[in-house]
Amino acid sequence: MIGSVSAVSCIDCEAGRYAIDTGSATLEDCIECAVGRYVVATGNDEAEDCIGCAAGRYVSEPGSDEAEDCIDCVAGRYLDVEGGSAASDCIGCAAGQYSETSGNDAADDCIGCVAGKYAEAEGSNEASDCIDCVAGRYVDVAGSAALSECKDCAAGKYVAVVGSSAASDCIDCAAGRYIDVGGSDSDTDCIDCVAGKFVEDTGSALESDCTGCAAGKYSTMSGSAACIDCEAGRYAIDTGSATLE
């Protein structure tokens, strides 16, 4: 009929928008999808037509019209819900963990620092952010979050390298020597038993582990692992003799 208005004269709201009410007269009546959401189709008539960005992604501008508008959370961060609306919605990997990939959608995507290392900061994004335990210490579990989680080598032991991952990495002081504190980082921390005393075991932790040479034996050198018998024709009455006199 001449002068009639056809429904085809009504224009779809464009992608990224929707209109709930009938009788919309302008494009501005079409409402933009909220931040964190998008819609690819045109002619949308309810807010639910807008789709939340997938977990691990966000969009901070309204009216997005394609999934590609959603931005990956950066490496070192994750987002475990849909519809992220800002980079700040992405959660940093916990201290002791890192993630080298972007778009992570779960805390489980964060990887624990290996044993022997730790990371104090949140949001670490590469394995190199994990720091070696210092010499003299070790940590035997993954995911450590502080230097304080690195354990001292026990008294009587030391380790000179960094990044030790087990108590067995700590090395015994040699026979004839001891060390009475933990956390030693060099064999030079091991102390010689004085002349006239010895210790035959490795890993001694006390000065009292050094035992005086028995009567008939002596030791003229410090750091002895054993005492020497007096030669034929000579004797030593006292224990702990350091000379042949």
Which residues does each predicted region cover?
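Disulfide-rich, cysteine-dense extracellular ectodomains and adjacent flexible linkers of secreted
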Residues: 1-245
